[in-house]
């Protein structure tokens, strides 16, 4: 008899973001049992932890959908299938014996499966924090590295620091609720979509956004964690004091594959190299899909990850059942719903 912390299934999916959730659906459609492991304590990955209110425009049939809404739809889509989730757990070990893959989690759960799919996005991530004096007093009170509720910033003075897509996108998204936004970047050039930057410049013309370039953060002033002013300086010795209720710093993520690095997989710049036809890694039975997968011509899009999930799962079917999958359209097969 198996211990309560030992499980046997057909497929293990590491990562419960959008691509991992669609892989769950694909497994269910092929009548494969599935366990999912994610280091976060909730389903949704970066979509719910980093940018739940951020609009996504390139999901087919949805002219626009927020990241949180997309995750909710994917959860509903995969709900009919009896999937087991192990949340708040990291995969710390992986062994292969007689074509059976056995993983161990940080919560001492042991899962045995014929196939393993890594849909871990950019891996475990941490925000690149500010190094200003006394920053700890303001963090998670009036200084944030992500936005979970845009309503917090209604009629507030907001300083946004950064020059990439996240800084630009959140400037656009908060411009309709904030009193004013100060966009601070140490360079005059931004690393973002030209269309988005043009929108920022139009907002600057009407006073909703003030572009503070080339400047960088120098000092925060406030009491009891409540921000009052942000001092910014440039390389010529110039300085400005910006009145502020909140500071949002978007300097990117420090990503790490964590223990996956020790599995013997071939990696390339924190991504896992795969066969571009099956998405199998250099270890048979282990696949990688979504942003973590690397192959020539790769497009880092959620849509691409969905297609990779379908292909990888069909290949898993052959390992699980020992026979080639008989392809059926979902319109023929259907999905049983309670």
From Swiss-Prot:
Gene3D superfamilies: FAD/NAD(P)-binding domain. Pfam families: Pyr_redox_2 (PF07992). It catalyses: 2 reduced [2Fe-2S]-[ferredoxin] + NADP(+) + H(+) = 2 oxidized [2Fe-2S]-[ferredoxin] + NADPH. Disulfide bonds: none annotated. Binds 1 FAD per subunit. FAD binds at residues 38, 46, 51, 91, 125, 291, 331. Keywords: FAD, Flavoprotein, NADP, Oxidoreductase. InterPro entries: FAD/NAD-bd_sf, FAD/NAD-binding_dom, Fd--NADP_Rdtase_type_2, Ferredoxin-NADP_redctase_2. Its cofactor is FAD. Its EC number is 1.18.1.2. It comes from the Bacteria. GO terms for molecular function: ferredoxin-NADP+ reductase activity; flavin adenine dinucleotide binding; NADP binding. It is an enzyme of class 1 (oxidoreductase). Homodimer. Belongs to the ferredoxin--NADP reductase type 2 family. This is Ferredoxin--NADP reductase. It comes from Orientia tsutsugamushi (strain Ikeda) (Rickettsia tsutsugamushi).
